[in-house]
Amino acid sequence: MITILIVDDEKLERRGIRFLLKREGDFQILEAANGKDALGILASNHVDILFSDVKMPYMNGLELTKAVREDHPEMEIVIFSGYNDFSYAREALRYGVVDYVLKPVDPNEFHKTFQRVMENISSKEEKQKQQNRKEDYLKKYFFLRYLYSGKEEDFVQLEKLTDETEDDVSQFSRMVLVSASNCLLYTSPSPRD
C-alpha cells in the first residue's frame, strides 16, 4: 500500500489534502504539523509520497525537502504554498519536487498532480522489476557457465552478481549435482583450490 505523509502546520489544510487523497484511492496517510515532526515520522516509517507546505515553524517545507532528498532520493514530493513566489518554486524544483501547487488547492489541479506522481511511482517500479529480471538472468547465466566450465572468470562474474560467498555457491553446485543423479556431469575443482 502506498504511504503518504502530509506536512502542514494548519490542521484544516491537512484535512483538505486528506479529503482530496481519499478521492484518489485507498492509501495509508500520515500527518505532521511541521518539518521537524515529519523527519521523526520518516525515520520510523516508509513513505512513498510527501505533500508539504512551504511556510511552517521549526523547519520549512524547502528545508524538509532538502533533508528528505539526502536520505530518501526516491521519494515523490509535492510542495504546497500560499505564496506565489518564484524563488520558492525554483528552489523546490532544484530539489526534484514533482510540482509546486498554489493554495487554495484546486481539486482538478491536485488530481493532475497526483496522477503524475502515481505515474512516476509506476515507472520506477517497472524499471526496478526489469532490473531484477536482468540480474536474475545474469546470475543464472554465469552460474550455469561456471557449472559447465569450472573457469575462475565465470565464478568471479557470479560472485560480483550475488551476495553469496564461495561456500554458498559450492553448496548450491553440489545440490544441483545431487539432483542431476541421472546425468553424468564432470566438475572441475574449485577455482580457488
What are these regions (language model features)?
Residues M1-T3:
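Extreme N-terminal starter segment of soluble prokaryotic enzymes
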Residues K11-L30:
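Two-component/phosphorelay signaling modules centered on CheY-like receiver
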Residues D26-A33, I41, A89:
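Short hydrophobic/Thr-rich beta-strand motif most characteristic of the beta2 strand and flanking loop
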Residues A32-K36, P191:
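Conserved Asp/Asn-Gly motif in the active-site loop of CheY-like receiver
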Residues L39-K134:
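CheY-like receiver
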Residues V105-S188:
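Interdomain helical linkers/hinges and coiled-coil/dimerization scaffolds
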